[in-house]
A protein has these predicted regions:
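Residues forming the flavin
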Residues: 1-559
């Protein structure tokens, strides 16, 4: 289409009273030979529709609007094929300088000249389109509540979803729970988890294809062009056997969590009747009874030790946000239908945010639930075959001892996520130990191996990226973006962590989080298909020119 420039000059908002608008029109049509220039009384609302009609009628390809701030317009105010520049005469000239003054008129004319020159030099952006067809299918890694929710929400909007789960069944940790903490008013009574209904809905959706007993063996490519190799995780097939190679547009990592290791001062593993909160949940899920593992007898007195998976600043010093509510829930398990049963909860901090405060009150109102703000100093076997807990009541400053049948440690959440940068450093160190240029380099590599050795074999996504096979991780192993303003974004565009893999959360929080991640993944594939940037310059269609003479082939620009 032949280039044609038009100028609209607004006389409203006090602009016409402060400036000689006809002189500005002369600048456009005289100095710049602009073929179309028109004054308008307003540049919003109905006047905006009239301007768009003029743009279409005159066949304008480039437009300068001299009026109010460009912030007053949305990105869809003008046809996408028309290039538009906006001169803020009101904010930049009229409000800043005296009206009907020579300098004011000169400032307005100079502003108009700058923007006409700018629009003359602008060239239409040609969005980048890859040679291969962009895929709009999504890959969800993880079949827990977050993964199932993300898959279902995306599938409901019409997108194809591939769901990969390493175990032989869907549901994750929520499928192993007896009951769920309340998720709706009045936030007092325990609820069914609802996970089986969610699994059934996912399995029945024709847009979702499920791979169980599988993992992502290799991930190549970029947004819209991720090539993923799905392999068997065992469970009837040879481990590592390739099941299928697929192409997807975006990836949602919903790999969940695992229990934290208990504090070393607690005798977990040494005393049979000291268990984790996940063990008690499995016990209730199996037959609805709470028994002592040591002899199978019914446990009528159960103690809960909060923050049992914390090791101060050395290991797990963050709050997992769900442990307190879980212990309150399990205390109600103990009391359910048993008037003579007692539950003791030892805590330093009781955290029940938001409406969960009502659930806390529900537990407080139960005569058989004893809440003690205290630090547990010792758990030992007693002469009755049970356990004796010695604790310091931090409210009263006194030492107390309680005899119980069973001790439950509230272990926190550790994300099921790999640190891609740490794994890459580990792989590089393995090479340097053998082939280092100097002894000092080999010694440094050996130290890195010792420091990062626990990352070996933790890969999840297996990205073929120079910067590492998984997402970069934050301080405590959660993959995130570091950007408060960009939730769900990771530092690998097109890959979105969600649920407990992204931050400690409960089932209801995981559902909400997964819905957001699904929306971001959909946004990614749609914007990629149009050749637009996804993050952080959302909607930008510009594409870089590479100076190949200075390229070192580090591959960072492509990863």
């Amino acid at each position: 289409m032949e280039e044609k420039i038009g100028v609209f000059i607004c006389t409203g908002y006090g602009i016409g009273e402060a400036l000689d608008v006809d002189a500005l029109c002369e600048v456009a049509t005289g100095e710049f030979k602009v073929p179309f220039c028109k004054t308008v009384k307003s540049c919003e609302g109905a006047a905006l529709s009239a301007m768009n009609a003029d743009i279409k009628a005159e066949g304008l390809t480039k437009v300068v609007i001299a009026g109010i701030s460009p912030r007053r317009y949305s990105s869809t105010a003008f046809p996408p094929e028309v290039m538009v520049e906006m001169v803020g005469l009101r904010e930049q000239v009229v409000w800043c300088l005296p009206p009907n003054d020579e300098d004011t008129q000169m400032a307005a004319a100079d502003n108009l000249r700058m923007y006409i020159t700018k629009i003359q030099q602008r060239k239409p952006l040609v969005p980048f389109q890859p040679e291969d067809e962009v895929s709009k299918d999504l890959l969800v890694v993880g079949g827990g509540v977050a993964g199932l929710t993300a898959a279902l929400e995306a599938a409901k909007t019409g997108y194809g979803v591939k769901l990969v789960e390493k175990s032989d069944h869907l549901g994750g940790w929520l499928a192993k729970q007896h009951k769920s903490i309340p998720t709706k008013p009045p936030f007092r009574d325990l609820e069914d988890t609802g996970i089986q209904e969610l699994v059934a809905e996912v399995e029945a959706n024709p847009n979702i294809r499920i791979f169980t007993s599988a993992f992502t063996a290799e991930t190549d490519g970029a947004p819209g062009l991720f090539d993923v190799t799905i392999a068997s995780s065992g469970n009837g097939k040879p481990e590592g056997e390739v099941i299928e190679k697929i192409r997807v547009g975006a990836i949602i990592q919903a790999t969940g969590w695992r229990p934290a290791d208990p504090r070393p001062d607690l005798p977990y593993g040494d005393l049979e009747d000291v268990i984790l909160n996940v063990d008690l949940e499995a016990m209730m899920k199996a037959d609805g009874r709470i028994t002592r593992p040591s002899d199978g007898k019914e446990a009528k007195k159960v103690a809960f030790i909060q923050c049992g998976g914390c090791s101060g600043k050395e290991k797990h010093s963050y709050c997992s946000s769900i442990c307190c509510m879980t212990s309150l829930k399990q205390a109600l398990y103990v009391r359910e239908g048993r008037d003579d049963a007692k539950a003791y909860i030892f805590f330093e901090f009781m955290r029940t945010p938001g409406q969960y405060e009502d659930f806390y009150r529900r537990a407080q109102e139960d005569d058989g639930v004893f809440l003690t703000r205290g630090l547990v100093a010792d758990v030992a076997k007693n002469e009755d075959g049970g356990l004796t807990i010695t604790a310091t009541d931090t409210m009263l400053g006194s030492e107390i001892q309680v005899k119980v049948d069973l001790v439950v440690i509230a272990a926190g959440m550790i994300p099921n996520a790999a640190d891609g940068e740490a794994i890459r450093a580990l792989e590089d160190a393995k090479v340097n130990v053998l082939d280092g240029d100097s002894e000092a380099k080999r010694v440094a590599a050996a130290e890195t191996l010792e420091k990062l050795g626990h990352h070996d074999g933790t890969q999840i996504l297996n990205l073929n990226y120079r910067q590492g096979p998984d997402l970069p991780a934050l301080e405590y192993g959660f993959p995130d973006s570091h950007f408060i303003c960009f939730p769900y974004e990771s530092r690998r565009t097109g890959i979105y962590p969600t649920g407990a893999a992204r931050q400690p959360t409960d089932g209801m929080g995981s559902r909400e989080d997964a819905t957001g991640a699904a929306l971001k993944a959909i946004q990614c594939v749609e914007m990629t298909s149009r050749g637009e940037a996804v993050h952080p310059r959302a909607g930008d269609t510009s594409y870089p020119d590479f100076m190949m003479s200075r390229c070192t082939k580090c591959k960072r620009c492509t990863e």
